């Protein structure tokens, strides 16, 4: 679905409409047809790699799974690329907020999490980063130390920020007070939504960038 989302951006289509259309086919369904900023965790990446490796041992090229892995690694960079394109490469010194660190909600697991890829890219460009996750803060400290600022909550993270990255779809992030958030941020703020859960119409004038 991520490839479809990226194509939608190029041709001017809305991936959410495409997803709904595909999902009406009972042979497919709509439950897992969501684009995003990549998968992580301990199971799915390991299982895909194991299948590719096992097939290679027996001389078989798992072309579909190789493509899945390639697309996923590319997708983990998509939020940063949107940010870079939005500011036309002028990133040094910008402050950003990262909402969500774990690879999925309801866990502190950050193994192969998209947030780690994003944070590394932002640091390389000289950005100042405030992060917040309901349960993964200690795990993040263990992994990357004090190279980012650890915020008390989602509102604290956005103070004086140029941009927000929504990386993990925690329920806590779903219905914030956008008016409060906009006032706390710098002029012309932007939200880059890695899970496509928000609507531009609700954001009180915050620029909205989604996937697809």
Tell where the protein language model's regions lie, with residue ranges.
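Structural/interface elements that position substrates and couple domains in central-metabolism enzymes
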Residues: 1-212
């Amino acid at each position: 679905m991520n490839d479809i989302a990226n194509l939608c951006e190029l041709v001017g289509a809305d991936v959410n409409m495409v997803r709904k259309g595909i999902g009406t086919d009972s042979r497919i369904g709509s439950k897992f047809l969501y684009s995003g900023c990549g998968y992580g965790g301990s199971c799915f990446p390991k299982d895909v790699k194991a299948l590719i490796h096992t097939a290679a041992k027996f001389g078989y090229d798992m072309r579909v799974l190789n493509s899945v892995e390639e697309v996923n690694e590319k997708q983990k960079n998509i939020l940063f690329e949107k940010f870079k394109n939005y500011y036309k490469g002028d990133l040094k010194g910008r402050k950003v907020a990262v909402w969500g660190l774990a690879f999925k909600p309801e866990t502190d697991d950050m193994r192969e999490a998209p947030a780690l890829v994003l944070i590394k890219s932002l640091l390389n460009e000289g950005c100042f980063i405030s992060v917040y996750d309901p349960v993964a803060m200690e795990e993040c400290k263990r992994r990357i130390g004090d190279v980012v600022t650890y915020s008390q909550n989602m509102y604290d993270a956005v103070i004086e920020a140029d941009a927000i990255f929504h990386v993990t779809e925690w329920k806590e992030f779903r219905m914030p007070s956008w008016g409060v958030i906009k006032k706390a941020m710098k002029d012309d703020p932007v939200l880059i939504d890695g899970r496509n859960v928000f609507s531009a119409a609700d954001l009180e004038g915050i620029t909205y960038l989604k996937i697809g």
